[in-house]
């Protein structure tokens, strides 16, 4: 039975003939069409909708079809009727929406799902008929009684798993700049006692995880870095400052193909102190501050259609790094440099407020403290051509471990514009592991111009990296 009166369904003619085959009962299923044209959670069907079916029931009763089971076609709506006991006909029919919290089971054991469905329930009927959010709820209304898996999938899609490892993505974006600053300082020769180095770069990466609720992604980044160096009278002794920005786009491997854009800028200072006259043993300390502006376009599947929500947030950070390295010259062109380093970082991530879209979320502001020791070794090669250009190559491997709370931080979200409580987002389990990273770079240096290409791999997240850069020294 269609419940809206628009494009009404017709009763089955001569259904009472089934009694001749021994069938004495039948089901009458009431659809949810009326919910498309109403924001109410309680709907009474009109007499004009019921009457044709009463005629069908009366005619079938005369033929011996005497029992009728009447229920809703929808998992999330319940049909209730009052019947005339004498004639078995329907006097009144009502549709009542089942609260989404019912499908979260025991709220004490499924608190996160319960809190989300509580917010979802509060959003029902808020937006106007014909809006995209209303269309989303229509999709949920159409889920059938035996299609509970579709409802669970829709809940999971809408809960904002794209924000699950937001801390790691913010940190990895900053790491791109750190790596480029390192290239400027260590891989390119200094032209004079006071040098200015500028480099444009582009890079690509991929992150994979086995943690449930954390989504794989690829990223593409490009940007510019600048470094000013003041070298002292003693080889290796100097100070300087650096700055740069990176624009990093993450493309998630979820069903909707969500996308996040990060724009981060850094500015910092450093000081290098040699411990011998040929600068084979050197200690460098650096510190910087960062500012980020980020946008999320979260896309999610509900039944068979993609919906989306858009949010923005800012980041603010400060970091301090100490590195001690020792150079061993193996041949005229080849050197080996083992080193140890530790980086301390504090990052504040502002509240994410999704301003547009469907089932918008608020993600609670948070922060992380990173303590990351690293030990590694670089094998460097340098060859001077007859033209004066220099061919450089570097193969490096290092082990680093995160001792702070980056992925361990509790990220929480809630359905925006509701009084529902916060629910927890998944944590990246792989962050408990250390990371072995391997990098190879190849460059050509002229007196002023130069370029590099690099590739790398991280065991944590099975992260593949590749990039190119062009620089100017003056």
Q: Residues of each region from the PLM?
A:
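Outer membrane beta-barrel transmembrane domains
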Residues: 265-268, 362-474
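Solvent-exposed, glycine/polar-rich loop segments of beta-barrel outer-membrane systems
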Residues: 212-217, 253-259, 295-314, 348-369, ...
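Beta-strand repeat architectures
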Residues: 1-2, 19-29
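Outer-membrane translocation/initiation segment of Type V secreted surface proteins
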Residues: 2-4, 8, 31-222
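Solvent-exposed flexible segments
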Residues: 292, 343-347
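Short, T/G/N/S-enriched strand-turn elements that build extracellular solenoid repeat scaffolds
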Residues: 8-22
């Amino acid at each position: 039975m269609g419940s809206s009166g628009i494009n009404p369904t017709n009763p089955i003619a001569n259904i009472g003939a089934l009694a001749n085959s021994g069938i004495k009962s039948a089901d009458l299923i009431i659809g949810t069409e009326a919910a498309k044209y109403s924001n109410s959670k309680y709907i009474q069907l009109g007499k004009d909708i019921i009457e044709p079916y009463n005629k069908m029931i009366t005619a079938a009763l005369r033929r011996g079809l005497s029992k009728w089971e009447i229920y809703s076609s929808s998992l999330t709506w319940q049909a209730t009727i009052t019947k005339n006991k004498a004639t078995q006909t329907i006097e009144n029919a009502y549709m009542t929406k089942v609260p989404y919290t019912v499908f979260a089971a025991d709220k004490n054991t499924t608190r996160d799902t319960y809190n989300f469905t509580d917010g979802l329930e509060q959003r029902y009927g808020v937006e106007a008929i014909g809006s995209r959010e209303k269309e989303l709820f229509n999709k949920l209304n159409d889920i059938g009684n035996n299609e509970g898996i579709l409802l669970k999938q829709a809940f999971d899609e809408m809960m904002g798993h794209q924000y699950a490892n937001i801390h790691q993505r913010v940190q990895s974006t900053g790491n791109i700049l750190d790596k480029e600053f390192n290239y400027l300082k260590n891989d390119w020769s200094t032209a004079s006692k006071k040098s200015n180095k500028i480099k444009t770069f582009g890079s690509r990466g991929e992150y994979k995880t086995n943690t449930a609720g954390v989504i794989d992604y690829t990223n593409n980044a490009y940007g510019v870095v600048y470094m000013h160096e003041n070298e002292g009278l003693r080889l290796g002794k100097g100070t300087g400052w650096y700055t740069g920005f990176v624009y990093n786009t993450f493309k998630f491997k979820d069903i909707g193909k969500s996308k996040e854009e990060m724009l981060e800028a850094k500015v910092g200072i450093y000081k290098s102190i040699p411990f011998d006259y040929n600068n084979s043993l050197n200690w460098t300390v650096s510190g910087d501050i960062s500012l980020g502006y980020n946008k999320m376009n979260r896309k999610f599947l509900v039944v068979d259609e993609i919906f989306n929500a858009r949010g923005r947030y800012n980041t603010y950070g400060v970091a301090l790094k100490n590195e001690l390295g020792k150079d061993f010259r193996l041949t005229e062109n080849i050197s080996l440099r083992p080193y140890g380093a530790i980086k301390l970082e504090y990052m504040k991530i502002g509240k994410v407020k999704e301003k547009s879209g469907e089932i918008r979320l608020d993600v609670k502001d948070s922060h992380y403290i990173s303590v990351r020791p690293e030990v590694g070794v670089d094998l460097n090669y340098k060859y001077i051509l007859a033209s004066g250009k220099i061919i450089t190559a570097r193969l490096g491997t290092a082990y680093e471990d995160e001792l702070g709370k980056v992925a361990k931080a509790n990220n929480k979200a809630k359905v925006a514009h509701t009084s529902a409580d916060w629910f927890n987002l998944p944590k990246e389990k792989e962050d408990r592991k250390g990371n072995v990273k391997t990098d190879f770079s190849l460059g050509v240096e002229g007196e002023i111009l130069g370029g590099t290409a690099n590739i790398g791999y991280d065991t944590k997240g099975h992260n593949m990296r590749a990039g190119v850069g062009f620089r100017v020294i003056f």
